[in-house]
Amino acid sequence: MERLQRLMMNSKVGSADTGRDDTKETVYISSIALLKMLKHGRAGVPMEVMGLMLGEFVDDYTVNVVDVFAMPQSGTGVSVEAVDDVFQAKMMDMLKQTGRDQMVVGWYHSHPGFGCWLSSVDVNTQKSFEQLNSRAVAVVVDPIQSVKGKVVIDAFRLIDTGALINNLEPRQTTSNTGLLNKANIQALIHGLNRHYYSLNIDYHKTAKETKMLMNLHKEQWQSGLKMYDYEEKEESNLAATKSMVKIAEQYSKRIEEEKELTEEELKTRYVGRQDPKKHLSETADETLENNIVSVLTAGVNSVAIK
């Protein structure tokens, strides 16, 4: 009976618009935090990894994540163990000594290769975080499906039990911000909008961080003076020559076929197929450029050594 009364009290609180979350609420993740999460997730493949997020709750619509740190735990393909409280306390003390005095705003973990959603173990872990802070966020990142220019990541929070009992909307809608992103079908199957809802994610980048990210994999001028092994270069040249001979045979065969085709058939004959002429030209140009650069590099290095 007491449990039912507590649930009813929670539902009354949740029915007021002032006490409900908003669909406009956005999690802002810094560049360094995102890079750390991706690097940690890729290092743990094929196992799951987890860590804690540091930041602040700016207002009712903004959660700012400025940094993350990894947690030592064992994981399986679908779950990770709970947080190590002793390690967390020691890590927070050491971070405060470096000037990182932000609070824990949630946790993150990886789903290598199978999308962003919360399993039953993840839901229980999130419950423990929300008992400490009702606005705690669970971020899931997929390091396998993430590619350059597109990070597969999502943020979640559990739906209030009282709202579920009274069939109330878990969040109030004051703008169209929360409706711009289409829900993932895989997450819907695993309980999205039934047990937990998705939060908007955005990224804070300063001018210096943008410059740093642009130069992350940028070629330096010194890379042009790097000497490659002559045997490997000879093997690559031989492979390129064999490839060009094969492409030339395909091109001559294509010319013979074109003689028997009409203009209408030629328009759709090679749609979606590789163009032997273009491929031959690109392969020849690439081989010539690589060999010219290799010869010039060898000459520069021989003069520099003298």
UniProtKB/Swiss-Prot annotation:
CDD domains: MPN_RPN11_CSN5. Residues 27-162 form the MPN domain. A motif (JAMM motif) lies at residues 109-122. One of its GO terms (molecular function) is metallopeptidase activity. SUPFAM superfamilies: JAB1/MPN domain (SSF102712). Keywords: Acetylation, Hydrolase, Metal-binding, Metalloprotease, Protease, Proteasome, Thiol protease, Ubl conjugation pathway, Zinc. GO terms for biological process: mitochondrial fission; peroxisome fission; proteasome assembly; proteasome storage granule assembly; proteasome-mediated ubiquitin-dependent protein catabolic process; protein deubiquitination. Its EC number is 3.4.19.12. It catalyses: Thiol-dependent hydrolysis of ester, thioester, amide, peptide and isopeptide bonds formed by the C-terminal Gly of ubiquitin (a 76-residue protein attached to proteins as an intracellular targeting signal). Zn(2+) binds at residues 109, 111, 122. GO terms for cellular component: cytosol; mitochondrion; nucleus; proteasome complex; proteasome regulatory particle, lid subcomplex; proteasome storage granule. Residues 1-20 are annotated as: Disordered. Component of the lid subcomplex of the 26S proteasome, a multiprotein complex involved in the ATP-dependent degradation of ubiquitinated proteins. RPN11 is the only catalytically active member of the lid and serves as the essential deubiquitinase of the proteasome. Component of the lid subcomplex of the 19S proteasome regulatory particle complex (also named PA700 complex). The 26S proteasome consists of a 20S proteasome core and two 19S regulatory subunits. Interacts directly with RPN8 and STS1. Belongs to the peptidase M67A family. This is Ubiquitin carboxyl-terminal hydrolase RPN11. It comes from Saccharomyces cerevisiae (strain ATCC 204508 / S288c).
